[in-house]
């Protein structure tokens, strides 16, 4: 659904990981923080988060802009739209709201779409960047009130 970058471990952390693997040490003190029923309940609660028509139209317009962008080989698919919709609902839920705001959508455009879009050869040669293009496209779409 999303592509996030968490970076690399520090030199020390990476060496410790390698040494623990060589020594056959496994993490044994892992305990669950949530059970299956709770996951299913949260999933249903996220699906119940309201997306007003104008916010849905805002999402669709952003998706459509990717299809018109010459720097992309092909624009975002309808499934990308659905992923943006679900991710926005989850963000709203985690923020303690039962409705999606345009800011939720804006915050997730990069994480949801960046791995779904491929730059053209010309764009790559011109040192274009998917995230910068997405930011530019989002600024071209009127934010609903």
Question: Which positions does each model-derived feature cover?
Answer:
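C-terminal engagement/docking regions of AAA+ P-loop ATPases
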Residues: 66-145
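Conserved AAA+ ATPase core "coupling" helix
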Residues: 1-49, 53-61
